[in-house]
Amino acid sequence: VSFYAENVHDFAWVTTPDFVYESGQWNGIAVHALFNQKNGQKWTKKAVVRTERAIEWLSTKFGMYPYPQVTNTDRLAGGGMEYPMLVMNGSESEGLILHEGGHIWFYGILANNEVREAWMDEGFTSFQTRWYMMDRYGDQGFDLSTSRYKDWQKKYWRFNNSLGSSQWGMIAF
């Protein structure tokens, strides 16, 4: 297997003999999903479909996906990490797949500095994740996209705060 990429500023490579491979495509773009065998019941079919759906939605909102393929891989722990053409997700969550895929635009394509311009990287990608979830699921999509932040907030935000979910997301990133 080999990949060639033009106009990328970062890359990653993953491998394990425990990966299961599935594939699909959207608009001529190859979609690959690699997931650990033990996560097969959760990931199978969902990861490819959700990645296809994410690339389609992001392409209609922010410009056509510029690469010939995208790979969505399972990773050891929760959360995710992104590179041009590759996202690593700690779950098969639709919101997480969209979020990490969104980084391909806001960080990947724009080549912005993730530290100096965090508002454009995490801030804008968090915004687009909520926008997608609301497009797909209506008003309840907002709650679906913020549920993990509410759990985190309860665990780590000990003092009494009066911030709403929408304010918390913008301040957190």
What residue spans do the PLM features occupy?
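Hydrophobic alpha-helical and helix-loop surface patches within well-folded domains
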Residues: 3, 32-173
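Structured beta-strand-rich cores of soluble
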Residues: 1-28
